[in-house]
Amino acid sequence: MSKECLLVAISNQKGGVGKSALTVVLASYLHYEKDLNVAIIDCDSPQHSLVRMRERDKKAISASPYHQQLVEKQWERTQKKAYPIIGSTAEKAREAADKLAEKENLDIVFVDLPGTVQSTGVFRTIVNMDYVLTPSIPDLIVMQSTLSFATTVLDYAKSQKDVPLKDIIFFWNRLKKRSNTDVLKTYSQIMGELKLSVLDSTPVSYTHLTLPTSDLV
């Protein structure tokens, strides 16, 4: 690679926690607002929802003068084309990321992984990333699965000197007024006791819970 490229996986062992939406939001913000060169590798097969989303966007723009004008205005403001979104498998994600980073001279590659550890190559890909972002929701079953897998991965990474993975970073997502505050508070405390990295993503309506966070905030 002509410059160091950060590889970041978006992963959770349960679906429905907002992985794909988060991937698009992060990539778009860093690409268009922070002027970083980014790309997304969609490994969430077989649906590949992000690849399909990009194809739908292209068709919509081609068929709509209004959307064409929006794209032109965005280009005038940012002078940046749309970032690449390519499909791959979890097993081949690292290889695809390296090739893409070399070709596009990227700063960050986001890898959207399947929502199950049973998919071939997920564990291998995770430990070969620089960082893993893990959106979490206050659901007992989701959190049990999430923490079990994450601690296993981190223990493995610490025991292997040649593993690139530096950290798994958690944050709460999809919090609503009817969310289970007991689960939220309990698992926030557990993650603090385990010294896991947790971003402060708590809405104002939950600040009375005084949830523990890491020094990353």
Segments (PLM) and residue ranges:
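Acidic, Ala/Val/Gly-enriched low-complexity intrinsically disordered segments
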Residues: D215-V217
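Conserved catalytic-core segment of NTP-binding enzymes
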Residues: P114-S201
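Short, well-ordered alpha-helices that flank and scaffold nucleotide-derived cofactor binding pockets
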Residues: V24, S28-Y32, E55, V127, ...
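Walker A (P-loop) phosphate-binding motif
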Residues: S2-L30
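Alpha-helix C-cap/termination motif
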Residues: E33, K103, N128, E193-L194, ...
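A general structural motif
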Residues: C5, D35, L106, L165-D167
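P-loop/Walker-type NTP enzyme "switch/lid" segment
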Residues: S11-V17, Y32-F110, G115-T116
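Conserved small/polar residues in nucleotide/adenosyl-binding loops
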Residues: T207-T213
